[in-house]
Amino acid sequence: MRDPRRREAGFTLIELLVVVAIIGILAAIAIPQFGAYRERAFRARVESDARNAATAEEAYFAEANTYSSDCTTLPGFTKSDGVNLTCTGNATDFTITGTHPGAPNFQCTYTSNPASGSPNLVCAAT
């Protein structure tokens, strides 16, 4: 027989279900936002690598009097993990194109044009 003065402690089933429902709602909000943060980080990584590769292209030109068509030969430049860079260059200009598999349909293209003095970086959805 139970002692009427002793009260049992603990959570009811309803209280536990309410807590589980609240956690589920918070997870449903947070998980898609986390994916968006990751994609923005990948996009920033591509843009940064394109700018850094362009700076390295200019350093390469100062040494060789031509631009490199191989991103791996650029002095002092190492691309970030996951970033795909394509460099094309000749004696007068270069183009660098960057993508990342974590940011589908996004591409950055850095185009130099020393004759006009207006190099530009264009990053956009493809």
Residue ranges: model-predicted function:
Residues M1-F11:
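N-terminal leader/signal peptides at the extreme start of proteins
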Residues A9, R43, N52-T55, F61-A62:
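Extended, polar beta-sheet/loop recognition surfaces of beta-rich domains
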Residues I14-Q33:
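Alpha-helical hydrophobic helix detector
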Residues E15, A44-E47, S69:
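Compositionally biased non-globular segments, especially hydrophobic aliphatic-rich helices
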Residues V20, E47, A54:
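Conserved catalytic core of two-component sensor histidine kinases
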Residues A30, Y37, E57:
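Conserved alpha-helical elements of the SDR catalytic core
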Residues Q33-A50:
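Aliphatic-rich helix starts adjacent to a transmembrane/signal segment
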Residues T55-T126:
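Periplasmic/extracellular, small/polar-rich flexible segments of pilin-like filament-forming proteins
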